[in-house]
Amino acid sequence: PGKTHMQQKQQTIAKTAQLSGRGLFTGQEVSVTFHPAPADYGIVFARKDLNGAEVPARIDNVVQQDRRTMLQQGEATVMTTEHVLSALSGLSIDNCVIEIDATELPGGDGSAKIFTDVIQEAGITTSEAPRRQLIINTPVSVSDGDAVVAAVPHDKPSLQVVYELDYDEHNAIGHQLHVFDFAHGDYASQVAPARTFVLEAEVRQLRAAGIGKHLTPKDILVINHDGPMGGNNYRFDDEPVRHKILDLIGDLYLLGVPIQGRIVAYKSGHALNHELCRALLKQYREQRRNQ
């Protein structure tokens, strides 16, 4: 079917790349080094401070945590992986070793931009190995209360994400709907810069629980009834829903392969995203068996 946007061969970064920062939840200083990896290696985190203990970015390694995605293999844990995985998925990187010297990835400004910037600067190389992918041919959906996320077939050879965010009317976020399609959208400029957001009321609860005491408006978007606080402005009119798309793309990359299909989400968060990912892994394994 002609040339499609879906990259047909596996890719990795062209050279080693580095960045550092502080964890969003822990506030710990952390250095990150991205290393090129061979075909079929996948995305693997390596804890430099734990003798290089590896944690593959796979749904089987997810440990349930509030408000973030956490992975564990053996003694090694890696926290807040969704933004870096979203950047790798968004830029079609199949294989990469992400070396870190603390448990949590850097938060940057709360978006995936620090990661897309460093990956694009390093450059991308293509191998001869064909890229495996999951083509959604059977609809699958998971829900929890009124929150739902579904994967359905798509008429284009690409991934499309439709997200509907619905906060109460009295909230500055309100109701937002955004559609991003890799067939004609540009992930690095349209999704990656969208920042993590919290409501002012939630910040008080988090601080009371001892979380995020170090955070300032440079680290995260705090929204009250008037909109962003602390001198921040929205980067997009619908920045909150775009960030939800960013998280969803990152969580779904725990499948280990790119998806061709449409993902439709309403009020979905990490736990539900992971549940969909598990259902898709089942579908992917069945497809591979029948090939």
Put a short name on every predicted segment.
Residues G2-D94, E99-Q291:
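C-terminal regulatory domains involved in ligand/effector binding and gene-expression control
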